[in-house]
Structure formats: C-alpha cells, structure tokens
C-alpha cells in the first residue's frame, strides 16, 4: 500500500498528512481486535447452539380464530362448509396465524376433505405441493401431525391442512388417491415420523434402510452415531486423463 501523499493548503504549500491516531512518525493505532469466537457461534463447552440468535422461544398456544378470518379465508371456509355437509364434524378448528389459513382436520376425514377441496368448483385446490410431519413432543397426546400444503392454481390461493395422531395409533388415510404427488411425501413422513398412511400403494421407507429401527425425526429419537467399520475397501487410482497442473 502506498504511503499517504502530502496535500496542499489553499496557498499551494505542501502540508504533511498525519494518519488519525498517530504521533510523529509512529504508525496509527489500530482498533482493538474483537474477541475470538470459540466453539460454535462463540459458545464454549457444550457446543450447544440452541440459544444462538433467539432460536429458543417460549412455546405459544395458537388458538382457534373467529370470523371474520380476513382476505379470501372466509370465502374458502364458506365454500367448503357449503360443499361438505360434515364440515362441523370434520373441522376441529380453524387457525389464522401469520397471514396463513390452517384447517385442523379429524384424522379419519382428511382424504374426504381433500377430495372436496380439489373437486368443488368454488374451491379448486388442484395441487398438493407438500406433505410433511411434525412431532410436538410434550404438547399433546396426539403429538404427530401431518401437514398438507394445498394450492389453487385456478384462484391463486393457498391453504394448509393439519391432522394429528398419537404415537400409539399413528394412522391416517392416504391422500394419494386424490393427490398423486403425495406418494413419496407420505413415504417420507412415514419413514421419519412413523405416521402410517392407510391405503398408500407402497408405504415403505424412502430415506432409511428397510430394516432401520425407529423414526429419526421424532423428538424422542436417541441421538448418537452409528459405528460403521469398513474392511477391505479398495480405492482405484485417480483418473489421469486430465491434467490440471
């Protein structure tokens, strides 16, 4: 880096430039260095980062919403109630949170509700873009939740369905007959959370080996490594057809 150049005052006489914080010929003082982080994100000892960035928050209870829900949510609820006579029995609660609509469905009714949401002309939720699982350990006896993201491409709307089951009876009707896109996603929810989708054409594990014990994304799944030992492995020589030297 070049040394600072002399500048001239208004009269054209060179005036030496002295760096801020320097005296005479001494170099300028540098700001004190910040303390070095140790471990993960500055945590020391345990390596636990759960408190970093405000990721730990008190669990809040999400209550059922009351009308009017706002936006197109009332139109969706009204159309579903009109098209589906068992609406009052099948819908456990309606939640509006963070600008999103979630219908909590009785487990045995989930496929019926999806059928109506897809086929009714006033609803037309043609696409199930996602089926995922959630484990709310300690929050409820029915701690395993299946979550369905539905999209109406006709009306450009999105809603969410949620159905909860217990670990002792983790059964839900499969929605693959209504939304074929749910096939592999239901398999993943079964593999990771142990939710059993009755009527699925081939409900097998999709990520873990078939003989794997347990469901890795349940909150009570034991953490720890699996010891694996490799013997007799041979590494082929590198491909020398290309030279990068």
Swiss-Prot record:
Enzyme class: translocase
Catalysed reaction equations from the record: a quinone + NADH + 5 H(+)(in) = a quinol + NAD(+) + 4 H(+)(out)
Region described as Disordered: spans on this chain: 1-54, 217-245
Biased composition (Basic and acidic residues): 1-10
Biased composition (Low complexity): 11-28
Documented EC number(s): 7.1.1.-
Domain of life: Bacteria
Biased composition (Gly residues): 39-54
Entry-linked InterPro entries: NADH_DH_suC, NADH_quin_OxRdtase_su_C/D-like, NADH_UbQ_OxRdtase_30kDa_su
Disulfide pattern: none
One GO MF term: NADH dehydrogenase (ubiquinone) activity
GO cellular component: plasma membrane
Membrane topology of this protein: Peripheral membrane protein
Gene3D superfamilies assigned to the protein according to its UniProt record, in alphabetical order: NADH:ubiquinone oxidoreductase, 30kDa subunit (3.30.460.80)
Keywords of this entry: Cell membrane, Membrane, NAD, Quinone, Translocase, Transport
SUPFAM superfamilies in the record: Nqo5-like
Subunit comment: NDH-1 is composed of 14 different subunits. Subunits NuoB, C, D, E, F, and G constitute the peripheral sector of the complex.
Recorded family membership: Belongs to the complex I 30 kDa subunit family.
PANTHER family (alphabetical): NADH DEHYDROGENASE [UBIQUINONE] IRON-SULFUR PROTEIN 3, MITOCHONDRIAL, NADH DEHYDROGENASE UBIQUINONE IRON-SULFUR PROTEIN 3
Function description: NDH-1 shuttles electrons from NADH, via FMN and iron-sulfur (Fe-S) centers, to quinones in the respiratory chain. The immediate electron acceptor for the enzyme in this species is believed to be a menaquinone. Couples the redox reaction to proton translocation (for every two electrons transferred, four hydrogen ions are translocated across the cytoplasmic membrane), and thus conserves the redox energy in a proton gradient.
Protein name (database record): NADH-quinone oxidoreductase subunit C
Gene that this sequence comes from: nuoC
